[in-house]
């Protein structure tokens, strides 16, 4: 249970976080326990975490602000181990370096700053920038579909995540349909635009209904006549050259 001083201080900080949150950060306490906070960090631009969404917790001692909180990150991210206490200068690993004037905003801003470096500590892990980007791309889906507590604490973010996922799925489906039909529909050409007699007869045959046998036979005879005429013309040309 929070001490009176801790409750008063954290209530004030919640109001400050609501009215003036730090860049890329939102945070809120649980309704039934003001000592347990949940935060969401949005990956800043030009970093491997860009557009990622990282959910974690701050668990404050009942004598806060005289001692620091435990800090964890729950969303897979490639930088910190999931649901593991992090050893940072403003975490409960280092009460000796803690400053009571620091706040929730100070703690989370420091966490974001440390996240974008390559410094190692207890709770950190090594991974490539490519791996971090893959985690960033999957983070919203993870939070919206695999983290009930995220959906409970941040219902608006969870709903927005679901909409984003649905939109991305629609765009992917549309791309697949376009790939399956890579050729545009052929332009229809009228018979009057066909100059070659043989091509015109073929076009007429294609336009006739399948059951019209009489017309098909007539066109067939016409086609044969054209072919014989062309053959005779070729023979005559060859004979003339000889």
Swiss-Prot record:
Catalytic activity: S-ubiquitinyl-[E1 ubiquitin-activating enzyme]-L-cysteine + [E2 ubiquitin-conjugating enzyme]-L-cysteine = [E1 ubiquitin-activating enzyme]-L-cysteine + S-ubiquitinyl-[E2 ubiquitin-conjugating enzyme]-L-cysteine
Pathway(s) of this molecule: Protein modification; protein ubiquitination
A single MF term (Gene Ontology): ubiquitin conjugating enzyme activity
One Pfam family named in its UniProt record: UQ_con
Subcellular location: Endoplasmic reticulum membrane
Domain of life where this protein originates: Eukaryota
Protein name (record): Ubiquitin-conjugating enzyme E2 6
Active site, per annotation: 87 (glycyl thioester intermediate)
Upper classification of the organism: Eukaryota, Fungi, Dikarya, Ascomycota, Saccharomycotina
Chain coiled-coil ranges: none
Family: Belongs to the ubiquitin-conjugating enzyme family.
């Amino acid at each position: 249970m929070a001490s009176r001083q801790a409750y008063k201080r954290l209530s004030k900080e919640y109001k400050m976080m609501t009215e003036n949150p730090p860049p890329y950060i939102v945070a809120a306490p649980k309704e039934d326990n003001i000592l347990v906070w949940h935060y969401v960090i949005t990956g800043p631009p030009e970093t491997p975490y860009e557009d990622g969404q990282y959910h974690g917790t701050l668990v404050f001692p009942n004598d806060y602000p005289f001692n620091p909180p435990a800090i964890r990150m729950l969303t897979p991210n490639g930088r910190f181990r999931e649901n593991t206490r992090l050893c940072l200068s403003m975490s409960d690993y280092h009460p000796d370096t803690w400053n009571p004037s620091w706040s929730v905003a100070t703690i989370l801003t420091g966490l974001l700053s440390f996240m974008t470096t390559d410094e190692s500590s207890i709770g950190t892990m090594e991974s490539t920038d490519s791996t971090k980007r893959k985690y960033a791309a999957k983070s919203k889906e993870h939070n919206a579909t695999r983290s009930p507590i995220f959906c409970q604490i941040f219902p608006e973010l969870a709903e927005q995540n679901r909409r984003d996922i649905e939109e991305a799925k629609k765009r992917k489906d549309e791309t697949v349909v376009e790939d399956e039909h890579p050729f545009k529909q052929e332009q229809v050409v009228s018979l009057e635009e066909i100059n070659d007699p043989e091509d015109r007869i073929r076009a007429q045959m294609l336009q006739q209904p399948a059951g019209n046998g009489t017309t098909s036979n007539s066109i067939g005879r016409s086609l044969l006549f054209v072919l014989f005429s062309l053959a005779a013309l070729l023979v005559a040309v060859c004979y003339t050259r000889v």
